[in-house]
Amino acid sequence: MYKHPWLPNLDLTDEMLKEIGVNSLDDLFNDIPAEIKINRLLKVAKDKPLSEYEIEKEIYEKVKKNVELEAPPFIGAGICPHYIPNAVKFIIGRSEFYTSYTPYQPEISQGILQALFEYQSLMAELLEMDVVNASMYDWGSALAEAVLMANRINGKKTVLVPENANPFHKEVMRTWIQGKGIKIEEVKYDKNSGEVDIEDLEKKSSSNDVSAIYVQQPNFFGIFESNIEHIIDVAKHKKALSIIGVNPLSLGLIKPPGSYEADIVVGDGQELGLPLNFGGPLMGIFAVRWDMGLVRQMPGRIVGITRDVNNNMGFTLILQTREQFIKREKATSNITTNEALLALANAVYLSLLGKEGIRELAEEIYFRSHYAAKRLTEIDNVIMPFTSDFFEEFVIKFPIEYNIINDKLKERKLQGGLKLSIHTSLFCVTEVHDKKSIDLLVSTIQEAIKSVETS
């Protein structure tokens, strides 16, 4: 009989195998090809299981190798550092909310259901959209679900995606949609402005097989798409769905997508009270305009208000026949317990800041990112390759290889931007980057360039 070296209470293994008609654990897993099985014990400890104290000591030794940065990271690419009020952390840490339980039973879940309804309402107001679900995994999965949703609605097989959309989101989308035979056709961007090439978009939208047109606002380069309303009109003319990806904080400065009649809106709530993390959760935003054809094809949970037999108002999950626990393979999505806790964090953050707070924060981010860009381009032969206005993120082109600059930044315990090419990098500046941090970044880069030019 199989005996696990550490886990107790496995005496019933043989009895369980017999009950399901299997002779051994090997027989249980015989569907897995032999060539990919690991036929050895995994070395999960040095010689023996470690005690709690030994584990803490080993982890502490590893943690000491971490570098403490002199300033918040200047790398973004869609995940940006922001200040998180302590009230956000405190409220979502309460035991009533800090659970993975899905509120199927409204009679015992009114608290979390109302909190999620408040999130949906706040996000709908911010986006000026009619229906918002109770969260997706992240921006990439929300985009993928939007493309799949468009395909279910109109049956078409091509989605137009700009080259200047976030490449990480596009990779997630490709993974999700490839099994459905949906084709991605990339639209060029103007190399001068950094915005979507409208002429190329109109040319590629001439096909009758275009299911959806996606555009990101601001785009991956941080640039505002000034022709966003025209792009929506192109989608309407071709009877394709418009999918808009938004940075929610940018809506403190620019028109919300609902104001120009976007069909579907996606994004990430990381900007609204969530930390940076290494492989941890994000929070996907998903919203649609009021059209039952769209609403009934939405993925994910939706919380609504109803009344009981005594006419008391209550909160419950609605339109559940869309979901996999009822429809199985015919469901709109297989997402179930999702990022409800993080949606609550977004709701708390939005409630704390309010409309004026969001506007003031967006203005502060705009000012600081423009200050950083101005200071960097004051260095000889350092330029911004794109001319259009930007928010939070921006591209800088250097006269020397960016790897050399990044090495110098790391020496000074600074995290530079995301390398885009040999000489260009995408930088992120938010409200947490003060003048001292930005000036340190600039002086370090200036020093790196000077050292190469004089060598």
UniProtKB/Swiss-Prot annotation:
Its EC number is 1.4.4.2. Keywords: Oxidoreductase. It holds the Pfam family GDC-P. GO terms for molecular function: glycine dehydrogenase (decarboxylating) activity. It comes from the Archaea. SUPFAM superfamilies: PLP-dependent transferases. It catalyses: N(6)-[(R)-lipoyl]-L-lysyl-[glycine-cleavage complex H protein] + glycine + H(+) = N(6)-[(R)-S(8)-aminomethyldihydrolipoyl]-L-lysyl-[glycine-cleavage complex H protein] + CO2. InterPro entries: GcvPA, GDC-P_N, GDC_P, PyrdxlP-dep_Trfase, PyrdxlP-dep_Trfase_major, PyrdxlP-dep_Trfase_small. One of its GO terms (biological process) is glycine decarboxylation via glycine cleavage system. It is an enzyme of class 1 (oxidoreductase). The glycine cleavage system is composed of four proteins: P, T, L and H. In this organism, the P 'protein' is a heterodimer of two subunits. The glycine cleavage system catalyzes the degradation of glycine. The P protein binds the alpha-amino group of glycine through its pyridoxal phosphate cofactor; CO(2) is released and the remaining methylamine moiety is then transferred to the lipoamide cofactor of the H protein. Belongs to the GcvP family. N-terminal subunit subfamily. This is Probable glycine dehydrogenase (decarboxylating) subunit 1.
